[in-house]
Amino acid sequence: MKQHPLAQYLEAVPDFPKEGILFQDISPLLRDHFVATIDAMSLLFSAKEWAEVDYLVGVESRGFIFASALALKHDKGFVKVRKPGKLPNVHASMEYGLEYGTDKLEMQKGNGKKVIICDDLIATGGSMQAAAKLCNEVGYEVVGMACLVDLKALNSFSHDGMTVRSVIQFDD
């Protein structure tokens, strides 16, 4: 598979945050190619799909970057999925597995609107899966999921028949 041109700007960092993990650092993309990155993520969905979406949901913390920028670009609202203790009036929470441990996410009550969930990178799919389940639990309808980088070798995640759309994929 031909890789997206933005892939060349990722920086692979071995043994971060723990030994045995090859971390894909998106910092160079954010610093030097942010507009191109948001444009590429925007193209993951058609104009018709964007027209039907009400909110972009960002998964803490790097998902906030992409969801808020896409929300601004497409004149949509922004909703946060946060780690414990960061939101008032939490309606639901969920624990999930990471490539290197476990964590927990929380959300406020939703309102039945349609959402696209955004994150920076999907490894095992744990945080995206938790965010999708939380969105449904609090009252949102998940109509799409997007990330910048998908480490496909570590996951086969889908939610209600939807797979995560990504700009950059690594199969090994």
Swiss-Prot record:
InterPro entries, A to Z: Ade_phspho_trans, PRibTrfase_dom, PRTase-like, UPRTase/APRTase
Localization per Swiss-Prot or TrEMBL: Cytoplasm
Catalysed reaction equations from the record: AMP + diphosphate = 5-phospho-alpha-D-ribose 1-diphosphate + adenine
Class of the enzyme per the UniProt entry, highest EC level: transferase
Origin: domain of life: Bacteria
Functional description taken from the UniProt entry: Catalyzes a salvage reaction resulting in the formation of AMP, that is energically less costly than de novo synthesis.
Protein name: Adenine phosphoribosyltransferase
Higher taxonomy: Bacteria, Pseudomonadati, Pseudomonadota, Gammaproteobacteria, Thiotrichales
Underlying gene: apt
